[in-house]
Amino acid sequence: MNYRIDTPGTREKVMRFLNEIGIPVRYEIGATGFTEGCRIDHGMLAVDPACRVSTVLHEGAHLAITPRCFRALMNGNLFAGQREMLRIMGETDLHPDDPLYRAVIQCSDPEATAWAWAAGIELGLPGDEIIRDDEYGGDGEEIRLALQMRSYIGVHGLAHAGFCEIRERNGMVAWPHMKFWTQEVGMPETAS
């Protein structure tokens, strides 16, 4: 049997997974944003029925790694939401090792890529469907290789944010196995 990439059944499987972990996802014909076929809309994901599975995973990853208290800021171009999140954090007196501070500085594109890979592996998808060769400026194959070798930089960011371990030890499994799928850490009540 030949595996087919980007089938409706696989896309539905990914969307169901995202909804189950708390990332709201819905179909919307013509949805498009920073990536073709997918739009981040105030912390939710709108997906065109023909969108690549890899795109759904990656854009969903951006929402999953963003702390829940800031997800609604993520809308369209993520950079504006991330800048606002950093501005808010700058007004607090949190120590850089505070869990929220650590989470905020670890939700960039490499972490989203590593998260998407882990989610795709969890769902049993082949590597060339999780990250396509023509993605990442044509470097998809190289990024896939780095992920397969567990040497991709985003893995370290996920570990720093608490999502996973870098290496197996003391009975803890390592990435791509995750301790949790969404960043739930919130603003401490004493933060100003």
Would you name each region that the model predicts?
Residues 1-27, 167-182:
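A metal-dependent hydrolase signature that marks the N-terminal structural subdomain at the beginning
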Residues 5, 40-55:
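Short pre-active-site segment immediately N-terminal to the catalytic Zn-binding motif
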Residues 10, 53, 108:
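Hydrophobic (often cysteine-bearing) scaffold residues that line and stabilize catalytic clefts
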Residues 31-36, 66-108, 129-137:
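Post-HEXXH active-site segment of zinc metalloproteases
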Residues 54-68:
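Active-site recognition of the HExxH zinc-binding catalytic motif
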Residues 106-122:
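An active-site-proximal "capping" alpha-helix that borders the catalytic cofactor pocket
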Residues 120-131:
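Short secondary-structure capping/junction motifs at helix and strand boundaries
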Residues 129-192:
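Pan-zinc metallopeptidase signature
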